[in-house]
């Protein structure tokens, strides 16, 4: 059964959504919060599978809260709001879904079913990753309702966002339940940004930008950000002294 946290500044809205989730028979509401700050605390404490998050809240909005979460450990996020003008931004920020108030029970059921499907696939991939050796020649990924085994030597980069960790090869991109930390430890990929790893042999060009930042262009033309803290190490690995 999925575990869920409901964050909304209106008590009635929290109670109503909790009741609708309970009626699905597939979700256990483990807590709620009346604002984003308290919600962040409860996310870290309760570690729910999914957060149903209002957007328009005082002081800190739901979208701002989303930006505070660690992409590697954060739960799935479903925005619940009366304002449809936020829909595009929500999906750009990689929210799992977007529900309009008043929440339609049938629409909510569809969201819950999708969540169950995605989380079940994630659990299967985690079982595969649990038996991986100290070094990975292949990376188990999920793509289009199938498990994809991606050869590590073909991987250009790996990156994380709110929807998970993604592995990009010379021919495809797929999602994996392995964390960036695991990929960094068990593959030749090196850290170039908090949310990106890159294969040194895939680098075609490094553009030096302002403020000590940089951007990698891979041999297939993919652009990867490089943060200041990793640029020096990256240069050293490439034999560049300045």
From Swiss-Prot:
The modification 4-aspartylphosphate is found at residue 54. Residues 3-116 form the Response regulatory domain. Pfam families: LytTR, Response_reg. The keyword Transcription regulation applies. Gene3D superfamilies: 3.40.50.2300, LytTr DNA-binding domain. Residues 139-240 form the HTH LytTR-type domain. GO terms for cellular component: cytosol; protein-DNA complex. Disulfide bonds: none annotated. SMART domains: LytTR (SM00850), REC (SM00448). PANTHER family: REGULATOR OF RPOS (PTHR48111), TRANSCRIPTIONAL REGULATORY PROTEIN BTSR (PTHR48111:SF3). This is Uncharacterized response regulatory protein VP0538. It comes from Vibrio parahaemolyticus serotype O3:K6 (strain RIMD 2210633).
